[in-house]
């Protein structure tokens, strides 16, 4: 059971009064062939996306450091607005669609929060139950409301942005061929990287490499993003309807939770970290991206102490579309905690028919779940996953 702790400002594990951060690390695996691809042309359905040069606040962005292009919206859920395929993820990059949509999903028995004991479901599938922004608390940890979504965007950094040739990066972002990308488009992408580097939301929970070990993010010393990664994207979202300003005063109301499956909001903050490594297609890491989802149960402004989530389930939801979506099969390997998609026919209309490539396969591998607070192996350590 997960109970509320007002001093911490979040819910805590009942047994040891620890912060609940449910982290599901997911690896997106795509394989069957290794081939470097040049971007010379894209689908005519491609649309240009221009970053706002004044507020540097893209509503969507893409992880594209290696052989996968994976888009996400600032609410931490899928978007099909970035890829010319109308999909969330493309593999290999600049070719066919791989994942149509995905998102984090949870369900729990909510007890003692004043809305009646009931099962509630939250997160994102085809419908989005969250909005961008963090949950705002006072100095005592009382929930005041949620941040205005307009103050948030998809933060994206790459550690070599200042010196790297960003032609391929910009071409993928703008859905144009590498020969057609403009100097202005490359400059906009570079400027966004710089903006996010110097405005990295470490205070809200975004990961970074604390180079000098002082516990505070310094953009002139530290490295933003998942430590060691070549590229990182980060979002923060919540289901608290009341929107407040920095002083905690009400400025709006947006109840997104019922948009998913009709359930009332719980008071969840979800942080998504996506990262990848700049390896080529012949290296396994060049065909993988990593995802970490941190879920905090903080409650609503009127949630009493002692409210709890019982029997919580937290999972990755996905609708994979592998090229031609009408001939896809899915499977799972329980021992490896691996779910995958593969083509039901020998040939695929998109990969074989358009790009003259063998059809790939891929899926999701759960690497680590939340700590269960139980000493199952009797080694004296209750921090087990």
What residue spans do the PLM features occupy?
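Bacterial Sec-dependent N-terminal signal peptides
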Residues: 1-39
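A long-range scaffold signal marking pre-active-site subdomains of enzyme folds
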Residues: 35-385
């Amino acid at each position: 059971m997960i109970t509320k702790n007002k001093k911490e400002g979040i819910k805590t594990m009942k047994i040891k009064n620890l912060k609940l951060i449910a982290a599901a690390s997911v690896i997106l695996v795509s394989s069957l062939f290794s081939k470097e691809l040049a971007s010379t042309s894209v689908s005519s359905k491609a649309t240009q996306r221009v970053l706002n040069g004044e507020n540097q606040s893209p509503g969507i962005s893409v992880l594209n450091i290696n052989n996968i292009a994976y888009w996400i919206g600032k609410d931490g859920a899928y978007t099909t607005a970035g890829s010319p395929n109308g999909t969330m993820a493309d593999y290999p990059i600049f070719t066919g669609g791989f994942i149509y949509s995905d998102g984090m999903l949870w369900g729990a028995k909510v007890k003692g929060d004043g809305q009646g004991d009931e099962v509630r479901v939250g997160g994102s599938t085809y419908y989005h139950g969250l909005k961008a922004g963090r949950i705002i608390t006072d100095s005592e940890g009382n929930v005041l409301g949620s941040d205005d979504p307009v103050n948030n965007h998809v933060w994206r950094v790459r550690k070599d942005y200042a010196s790297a040739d960003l032609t391929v990066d910009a071409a993928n972002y703008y859905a144009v061929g590498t020969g057609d990308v403009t100097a202005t488009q490359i400059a906009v992408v570079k400027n966004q990287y710089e903006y996010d580097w110097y405005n990295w939301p470490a205070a809200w929970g975004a990961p970074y490499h604390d180079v000098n070990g002082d516990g505070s993010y310094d953009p002139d010393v530290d490295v933003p993003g998942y430590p060691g990664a070549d590229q990182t994207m980060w979002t923060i979202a919540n289901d608290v309807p009341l929107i407040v300003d920095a002083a905690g005063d009400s400025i709006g109301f947006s109840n997104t939770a019922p948009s998913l499956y009709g359930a009332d909001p719980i008071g969840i903050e979800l942080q998504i970290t996506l990262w990848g490594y700049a390896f080529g297609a012949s290296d396994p890491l060049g065909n993988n991206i990593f995802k970490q989802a941190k879920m905090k149960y903080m409650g609503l402004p009127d949630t009493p102490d002692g409210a709890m989530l019982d029997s919580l389930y937290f999972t990755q939801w996905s609708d994979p579309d592998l090229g031609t979506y009408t001939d896809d099969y899915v499977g799972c390997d329980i021992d490896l905690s691996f779910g995958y998609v593969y083509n039901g026919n020998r040939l695929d209309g998109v990969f074989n028919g358009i790009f003259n490539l063998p059809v790939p396969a891929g899926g999701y591998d759960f690497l680590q779940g939340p700590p269960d607070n139980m000493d199952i192996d009797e080694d004296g350590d209750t921090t087990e996953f």
